[in-house]
A protein has these predicted regions:
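Short, well-ordered beta-strand segments
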Residues: 42-44
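Catalytic core of pol beta-like nucleotidyltransferases
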Residues: 1-26, 32-38, 47-100
Length: 100
């Protein structure tokens, strides 16, 4: 995993704060691969929230807070509502992701 301890702890704290303590968090993509270079911070979350409006608000607030705390980095946040439509990116994230 190519994130510092500070980045890992900050991401986990911020996402659980906005999406609920029961949320499932994964880092996937090139930052999950120690041999890769560069790359966005790709995050997958199955939130503890159920209402679409609450999820949208949580996503916006979490991304703003992460940018303030981690600086200007490209952060991709993939949210799987569980009860929503299945997207292929969910499978990729779950198969290749590392739990935070």
């Amino acid at each position: 995993m190519r994130l510092t301890k500070y980045q890992q702890e900050t991401i986990k704290r911020v996402l659980l704060k906005h999406f609920g303590e029961g949320s499932d968090l994964l880092l996937f993509g090139s930052r999950a691969d120690d041999n890769a270079r560069g790359g966005d911070i790709d995050l997958y979350i199955e939130p503890d929230l159920h209402e679409a409006d609450d999820i949208v608000e949580a996503k916006l607030n979490a991304l703003v807070e992460l940018h303030l705390l981690l600086g200007e980095q490209k952060i991709v946040l993939v949210v799987n509502r569980k009860s929503g439509r299945f997207l292929p990116i969910y499978k990729i994230a779950k198969e290749s992701g590392i739990r935070l």
